[in-house]
């Protein structure tokens, strides 16, 4: 209600954030919920909007603590933050680092402005305020924290250099319980983003709009794929 002509240009999109947290942290929440929330925001604010898509916030428990199961979605995260130090220094389940990178990758590749809450770039733990305001750490990082830091830096560097991610159309390619794929496209420059919540590898055949593309696709991380100008096969 505060975003519009003569008002604010943008604010935190908590509707998308809350659904993103549930989707990436919980195995029982499918990507349909997140895609619906994102499409609803596009309806209200437009695809090329100035809304901020956040990794965390001082009014929420840390995502990684939800993802690791160190704090429950059913409990009051603010009370938890006052009564105990959630997760101590690192999450109890280190697969939560991978889930956090998925959340950050989502924010970095959708329209809008990606925003990192301090500490999320290394996966700091914590409940709600004041437990999510711990002192920032810059040294003695674990292997999981180093991985999150390196991939976050790569994602943000890519975001800053990609016209498709900054200005491109948003086209969903696959929206399922465990798999989410979409295309960002800007005048022949395309970026395909794929998320997989399955515990094992999956092979996807994605139909892409036929057009002349500038150059070939390259994997940002270690993903494997093949491509023939209209179909992208991702392993």
Labelled PLM ranges:
Residues 96-97, 109-116, 124-235:
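Carbohydrate-interacting/catalytic domains
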Residues 39-45, 103-110:
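Short amphipathic alpha-helices and their capping/turn segments at secondary-structure boundaries
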Residues 25-30, 49-67, 175-186, 227-235:
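Short flexible/disordered coil segments
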Residues 94-102:
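Alpha-helix-centered segments that form part of catalytic cores
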Residues 3-6, 53-85, 104-144:
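Aromatic/acidic polysaccharide-binding cleft in carbohydrate-active enzymes
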Residues 16-18, 81, 219-222:
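A generic structural motif
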Residues 1-54, 125-154, 163, 184-187, ...:
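Active-site-proximal helices and loops of the catalytic beta/alpha 8
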Residues 87-92:
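Surface-exposed cleft-lining segments at the edges of enzyme active sites
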């Amino acid at each position: 209600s505060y975003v519009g002509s003569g008002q604010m240009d943008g604010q935190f999109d908590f509707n998308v954030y809350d659904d993103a947290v549930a989707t990436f942290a919980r195995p029982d929440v499918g990507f349909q919920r997140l895609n619906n929330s994102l499409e609803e925001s596009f309806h209200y604010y437009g695809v090329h909007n100035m809304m901020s898509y956040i990794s965390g916030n001082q009014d929420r428990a840390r995502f990684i603590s939800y993802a690791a199961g160190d704090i429950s979605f059913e409990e009051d995260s603010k009370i938890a933050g006052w009564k105990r130090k959630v997760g101590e220094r690192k999450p109890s389940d280190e697969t939560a680092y991978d889930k956090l990178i998925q959340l950050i990758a989502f924010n970095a590749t959708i329209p809008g402005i990606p925003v990192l809450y301090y500490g999320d770039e290394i996966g700091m733990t914590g409940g709600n305020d004041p437990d999510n305001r711990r002192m920032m750490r810059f040294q003695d990082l674990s292997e999981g924290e180093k991985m999150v830091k390196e991939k976050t830096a790569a994602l943000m560097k890519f975001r800053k250099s990609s016209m498709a991610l900054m200005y491109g159309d948003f086209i969903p390619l696959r929206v399922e319980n465990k798999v989410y794929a979409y295309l960002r496209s800007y005048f022949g420059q395309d970026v395909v983003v794929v998320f997989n919540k399955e515990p094992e590898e999956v092979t996807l055949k994605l139909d892409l709009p036929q057009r002349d593309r500038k150059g070939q696709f390259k994997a940002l991380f270690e993903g494997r794929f093949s491509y023939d100008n209209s179909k992208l096969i991702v392993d």
